[in-house]
């Protein structure tokens, strides 16, 4: 039986964050007949300025609130008759999870459970849930799989082996989603993605952090020797993959989304330095002089890589960005959007980067 899903009313959680906002900026104009309700707590990494291009769209509504607030979530399900949940909301910065793990458990585990149970209650009719009319899509991370050696890649069969409070909380939420599918027949899909980059990312993450510091010729902190390897995925390619999985993915399946762009952290920093120097008309190599190697992060996974073959083969997903073109465009975006950067570089940002 086909499980093609046609969303009518979509609850998007965390839609003011980096990935959720990029998803909404692409989907709201793409699907004018679909209603999108964005529930976001507007924590430090959520920025409503990002959503200004769609804030007056007839098919878009913003709700300020917490996914762990059961009464609020239930009220939204009662009011909006959601057919679909696209669950982005999460605490996601590993360093912060080490400092405050309970905040990650509350949002990533308790918040996910709250949403799952509201969906279960709202979508159950005479003891069953229509597997085509409804869908709960949980967006997750490759960090739940732990670390790789020099070879190999994560895929949908990789065992879970989380090493940080962040990845453990996301692993817990993944298991809850599958448990609701197995126990209650909730129609679910899950995706695990590699590291994202692109416009509107909060500048605590590696790429925007290094762009802003290289611009200012400030010290560029690199963990350990910079040998850790990440697989980089442009956020717009990720958003398009999510759209594809949301509509055509098979119920209870997991899809891995990756960029096939593995790079050592130090190599990424070197490239960013040179791109910033070039864009600002400085001698290439100037920003590299600010690289400072700092004590490695506890439990720092050595290497991530994603095999996205299932998504590419079954659903025909392709990427529109190479890492080289995407990184160049990302540098240009951050250098051109000073007002957006200033809006997020408040005390919460300064407190964050001072610890890095």
PLM segments and residue spans:
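Residue-level recognition of oxygen-bearing side chains
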Residues: 72, 103, 110, 202-206, ...
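Hydrophobic alpha-helix immediately C-terminal to the catalytic Tyr-X-X-X-Lys motif of short-chain
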Residues: 172, 176, 180, 210, ...
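Short histidine/acidic/glycine/proline-rich micro-motifs that form metal-
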Residues: 42, 195-198, 228-229, 297-298
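C-terminal substrate-binding subdomain of Rossmann-fold SDR/epimerase-dehydratase oxidoreductases
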Residues: 9-11, 23, 36, 65-68, ...
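N-terminal Rossmann-like NAD(P)+-binding domain of SDR-like oxidoreductases, especially those catalyzing
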Residues: 1-196, 329, 334-355
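The catalytic Tyr-centered alpha-helix of NAD(P)H-dependent dehydrogenases
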Residues: 162-169, 199, 203, 207, ...
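Short aromatic-enriched loop/helix-cap "lid" or pocket-rim segments at secondary-structure transitions
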Residues: 48-51, 148-151, 201-204, 235, ...
């Amino acid at each position: 039986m086909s499980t093609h899903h046609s969303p009518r009313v979509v609850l998007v959680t965390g839609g003011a964050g980096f990935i959720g906002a990029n998803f909404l900026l692409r989907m709201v104009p793409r699907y004018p007949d679909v209603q999108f309700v964005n529930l976001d707590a507007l924590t430090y990494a959520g920025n409503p300025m990002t959503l200004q291009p769609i804030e007056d769209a007839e098919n878009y509504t913003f709700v300020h609130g917490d996914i762990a607030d059961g009464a609020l979530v239930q009220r939204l399900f009662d009011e909006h008759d959601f057919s679909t949940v696209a669950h982005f909301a999460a605490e996601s910065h590993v360093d912060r999870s080490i400092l405050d793990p309970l905040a990650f458990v509350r949002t990533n585990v308790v918040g996910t459970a709250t949403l799952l149970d509201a969906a279960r209650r709202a979508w159950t009719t005479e003891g069953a849930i229509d597997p085509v009319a409804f869908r709960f899509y949980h967006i997750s991370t490759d960090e739940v799989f732990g670390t790789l050696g020099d070879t190999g890649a994560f895929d949908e069969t990789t065992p879970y082996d989380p090493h940080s409070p962040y990845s453990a909380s996301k692993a817990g939420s993944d298991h809850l989603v599958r448990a609701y599918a197995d126990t209650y027949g909730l129609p679910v899909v899950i995706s695990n993605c590699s590291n994202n980059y692109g416009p509107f990312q909060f500048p605590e993450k590696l790429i925007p952090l290094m762009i802003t510091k290289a611009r200012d010729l400030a010290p560029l902190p690199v963990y350990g020797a910079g040998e850790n390897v990440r697989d980089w995925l442009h956020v717009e390619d990720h958003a398009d993959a999510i759209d594809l999985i949301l509509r055509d993915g098979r119920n209870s399946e997991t899809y891995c989304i990756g960029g096939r762009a593995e790079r050592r952290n130090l190599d990424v920093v070197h490239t960013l330095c040179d791109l910033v120097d070039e864009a600002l008309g400085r001698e290439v190599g100037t920003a590299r002089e600010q690289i400072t190697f700092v004590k490695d992060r506890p439990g720092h996974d050595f290497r991530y890589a994603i095999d996205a073959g299932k998504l590419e083969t079954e659903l025909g997903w392709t990427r529109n960005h190479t890492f080289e073109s995407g990184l160049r465009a990302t540098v240009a975006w951050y250098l051109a959007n000073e007002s957006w950067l200033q809006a997020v570089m408040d005390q919460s940002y300064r407190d964050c980067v001072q610890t890095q």
